[in-house]
Amino acid sequence: MLISPACWRKFLKPRMATFISDLKAINPRLKIAYHSDGVILPIIPELIEIGVDVLNPIQPAAMDPAEVKRQFGKQLCFWGTIDEQHTLPFGTPADVRREVVARINTIGENGGLILAPTHHVQQDTPMENFWAMAQTITGTPYGSRQYRGHAAGHLSGC
């Protein structure tokens, strides 16, 4: 986090809670996505409390995606999880494929995953790694229409 959890609680949480509450009063089916880089484990329960539905990005270098899923997977959908700091730019295509499959098998279990890099694919990412990610996603059950429908049902539209 760029600010301490205490500062987040004091300055941002009350305003976010009001904003999210107002939005969901207008449309109760609305899904709220929250983006924050780094380690945000201390505030995840409070994000859930104020109405956040989707958490982005879940950086593997900062937080263990499997542990975050274990703790909060029934309340949140996770967007990201493919390591843009190490695996995509510096790994091999085989490393990328292994990571994609691992994320599908752990974070994607029972739905609640929007599988993507943790950030924009950076310029230093080899195209072979980008294509390994894309082809592995689309070549697995996760990339099929049937599975996407199953995953989406996990959080009523996540």
State where each predicted segment sits.
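Active-site loop segments of alpha/beta catalytic cores
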Residues: M1-C158
